[in-house]
């Protein structure tokens, strides 16, 4: 049994029916209703305001858990409310002020497959008996077919799936003909939006089959998984990094992170198997892998280089800015930006991942939320003020300037792999020539703070106008004085200008 906050995980109820033409119209300006709010997710509030109200019932460790609340984003309500009830969970939705006050969700009766069959037993006569016989025969045929289908699926599951609980109690959902990508893109562009309400259920984890481990680190593993035939990424956090899982889950469920250059969020889940707890973060899957791995194998032309760095700058600018309104977001600083935490998409753009150390700030309340995570960022990418411990920890702008320093180092990594005049450098991490492979805090402090060294700029860059502009830009990210560094928005505008000048040059030619 997991204690404290860990008993009620933040899980997503995800069932995606095939959208009709009418469903595909955006529902941004839906009317808001006052709803009764009951359950742990409500805190001290007894009501909330959203576009739909709900009442849910789920079974957690043998206990019936009732919750009431509201969906603040229409697409979330649409996805959840159309989920058919299962033996372990049910949700009923409505629209109207306080409409969920007298609604209590009911679990389906065991073994009730065809609700209308009881009516047939009340009828008499030859015709009715014939219909009942036909229905029973059809049910038997379907039952045999489903059993064979389930047995075939179980034979395909590997031992890892057994360990993570994807066989026992497997719940399937009818998602029509729509793919996961289409439904997620329709509901949340390519980011997550804010997460679904805290409905206590285990649907998501039990529907995912883990296929292969694609990455390991000191804080956990990343697996390629399959959900209803679609690839997803499953990050399984180790117990030592529980705070990072909780932080990412909190961010994705409270902040509108809908952006094509932020890793798209699907669900967060927790399972307890064999006396151990697995913490899952389920996101979009990008088969190209991290920017770190991509640069080691791939050289870049001018267009692909600019596409990568501009997309990273766009994602960082979106994190840093605060957006006001009902569809707004708090300002966020990443605090661990590096090439390993940036993923490459099929279209050549990138998206920023791993928000486990992120800091949030709201201007309206002037509240700085640094979380409660003992983990620190990557030493190689630490800014001078972090290394010499002069950073103003109570100032949000300080954390944004730390991100800008790290962005400059990532920009340097990418620029080295851009071919100009037939010349290109091998991939190397920042400060590869002055610190060991796993530098200590003191190693980096001496190089960056005492000696004030910066990554070397090759001479060949100055014969290429694009690389010359990028070199100037990265130097403005590396000022020893944090307040002198560029902002993410200024970097984005500068890179856009460089990209536009390249397009103009091609047109003139």
UniProtKB/Swiss-Prot annotation:
EC category: transferase
Residue ranges of domain Protein kinase in the record: 208-502
Transmembrane intervals: 124-146
EC number(s) stated in the UniProt entry for this protein: 2.7.11.30
SUPFAM superfamilies according to UniProt: Protein kinase-like (PK-like), Snake toxin-like
Binding site for ATP: 214-222, 235
Positions of the catalytic residues: 336
Cytoplasmic side: 147-509
GO CC term, one of those recorded: plasma membrane
Keywords attached to this entry: ATP-binding, Glycoprotein, Kinase, Magnesium, Manganese, Membrane, Metal-binding, Nucleotide-binding, Phosphoprotein, Receptor, Serine/threonine-protein kinase, Signal, Transferase, Transmembrane, Transmembrane helix
Domain GS: 178-207
Residues with PTM Phosphoserine: 501
Organism expressing this protein natively: Mus musculus (Mouse)
Location within or outside the cell: Membrane
Reactions catalysed according to its record: L-threonyl-[receptor-protein] + ATP = O-phospho-L-threonyl-[receptor-protein] + ADP + H(+); L-seryl-[receptor-protein] + ATP = O-phospho-L-seryl-[receptor-protein] + ADP + H(+)
Phenotype of null mutants: Deletion mutants show a recessive embryonic lethality. At 7.0 dpc, mutant embryos did not show any special abnormalities except a smaller size. However, at 8.0 dpc, mesoderm formation is initiated but its development is arrested around the mid/late streak stage. In an osteoblast-specific manner loss of BMP signaling via ACVR1 directs osteoblasts to increase endogenous bone mass. Additionally, mice lacking ACVR1 in cartilage show reduced SMAD responses, but also decreased p38 MAPK activation.
CDD domains registered for this protein in UniProt: STKc_ACVR1_ALK1 (cd14142), TFP_LU_ECD_ALK2 (cd23535)
Record protein name field: Activin receptor type-1
Membrane topology annotation: Single-pass type I membrane protein
GO molecular function: activin binding; activin receptor activity, type I; ATP binding; BMP receptor activity; cadherin binding; growth factor binding; metal ion binding; protein homodimerization activity
Chief location: membrane
GO annotation, biological process: acute inflammatory response; atrial septum primum morphogenesis; atrioventricular valve morphogenesis; BMP signaling pathway; branching involved in blood vessel morphogenesis; cardiac muscle cell fate commitment; determination of left/right symmetry; embryonic heart tube morphogenesis
Residues that carry a glycan: 102
């Amino acid at each position: 049994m997991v204690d404290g906050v860990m008993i009620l995980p933040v899980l997503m109820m995800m069932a995606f029916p095939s959208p009709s033409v009418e469903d595909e119209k955006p529902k941004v300006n839906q009317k808001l209703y006052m709803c009764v709010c009951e359950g742990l997710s409500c805190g001290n509030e007894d009501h909330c305001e959203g576009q739909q109200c709900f009442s849910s019932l789920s079974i957690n460790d043998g206990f019936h858990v009732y919750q009431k609340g509201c969906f603040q984003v229409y697409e979330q309500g649409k996805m959840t409310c159309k989920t058919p009830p299962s033996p372990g969970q049910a949700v009923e939705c409505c629209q109207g002020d306080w409409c969920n006050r007298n609604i209590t969700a009911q679990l389906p009766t065991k073994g009730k497959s065809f609700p209308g069959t009881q009516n047939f037993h009340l009828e008499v006569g030859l015709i009715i008996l014939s219909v009942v016989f036909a229905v029973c025969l059809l049910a038997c045929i379907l039952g045999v077919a489903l059993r064979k289908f389930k047995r075939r699926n179980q034979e395909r599951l590997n031992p890892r799936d057994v360990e993570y609980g994807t066989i026992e109690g497997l719940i399937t959902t009818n998602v029509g003909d729509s793919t996961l990508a289409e439904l997620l893109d329709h509901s949340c562009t390519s980011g997550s939006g804010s997460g679904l309400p805290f409905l206590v259920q285990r649907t998501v984890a039990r529907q995912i089959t883990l296929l292969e481990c694609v990455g390991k680190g000191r804080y956990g593993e990343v697996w390629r998984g399959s959900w209803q035939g679609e690839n997803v990424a499953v990050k399984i956090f180790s117990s030592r990094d529980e705070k990072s899982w909780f932080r990412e889950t909190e961010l994705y469920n409270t902040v509108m992170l809908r952006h094509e250059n932020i890793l798209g969020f699907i669900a967060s889940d927790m399972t307890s198997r064999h006396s151990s707890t697995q913490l899952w973060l389920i996101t979009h899957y990008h088969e190209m892998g991290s920017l770190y791995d991509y640069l080691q194998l791939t050289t870049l032309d001018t267009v692909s280089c600019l596409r990568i760095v501009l997309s990273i700058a766009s994602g960082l600018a979106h994190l840093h800015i605060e957006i006001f309104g009902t569809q707004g977001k708090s300002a966020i600083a990443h605090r661990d930006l590096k090439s390993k935490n940036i993923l490459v998409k099929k279209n050549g753009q990138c998206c920023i991942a791993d928000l486990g150390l992120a800091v949030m700030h709201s201007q309206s309340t002037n509240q700085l939320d640094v979380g409660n995570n003992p983990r620190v960022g990557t030493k190689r990418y630490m800014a001078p003020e972090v290394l010499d411990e002069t950073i103003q920890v109570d100032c949000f702008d300080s954390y944004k300037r730390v991100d800008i320093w790290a962005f400059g180092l990532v920009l340097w990594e990418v620029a080295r792999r851009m071919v100009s005049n037939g010349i290109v450098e091998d991939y190397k991490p920042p400060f590869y020539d002055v610190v060991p492979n796993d530098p200590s805090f003191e190693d980096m402090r001496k190089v960056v703070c005492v000696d004030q060294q910066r990554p070397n700029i090759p001479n060949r860059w100055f014969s290429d106008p694009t690389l010359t502009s990028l070199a100037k830009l990265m130097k403005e990210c590396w000022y020893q004085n944090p307040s002198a560094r560029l902002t993410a928005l200024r970097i984005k505008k500068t890179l856009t200008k460089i990209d536009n000048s390249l397009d103009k040059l091609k047109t003139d030619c």
